[in-house]
Amino acid sequence: MLILLMIKKIAQYCVSMGLIFLCLLAGINLQTWLGIAIPGSIIGLLILFGLMASGLVPVEWVKPSATLFIRYMILLFVPISVGLMVHFDTLLANLAPILASAIGGTLIVMVTLGLILDRMLKKGKKSCG
């Protein structure tokens, strides 16, 4: 009985990981085929989101591996952080534009989302009352 449960759990992880990697592969191939500047991983993420939002892929099918990726996400940033330290002098030389774009972009997103939410809430109140 325990072996069957283990096999079922392993199968769930395999299906989950397979779906995520198939969407990643589809995104990379689509990006290469179309020649657009959006990274293939982002396109794959949007494909996976679209499949889950439309109900073609139930969330439960993706959840095991997604939970695993989220749990160990910090480890995935270590190579990127080390790679940034190689170019520390370049980062330091461009610190002002980097900070300006990060802070400015954050403010633009916050204000835009605030305005959209405000309009949506006002429309919701008008239709209710």
UniProtKB/Swiss-Prot annotation:
UniProt keyword terms in alphabetical order: Cell inner membrane, Cell membrane, Membrane, Transmembrane, Transmembrane helix
Main subcellular location: membrane
Localisation per UniProt entry: Cell inner membrane
Keyword Repeat: no
Residue runs in coiled coils: none
Record-annotated membrane-spanning stretches: 10-30, 33-53, 73-93, 97-117
GO cellular component, one term: plasma membrane
Keyword Transmembrane on entry: yes
Family in the record: Belongs to the UPF0299 family.
Protein name: UPF0299 membrane protein VC_1233
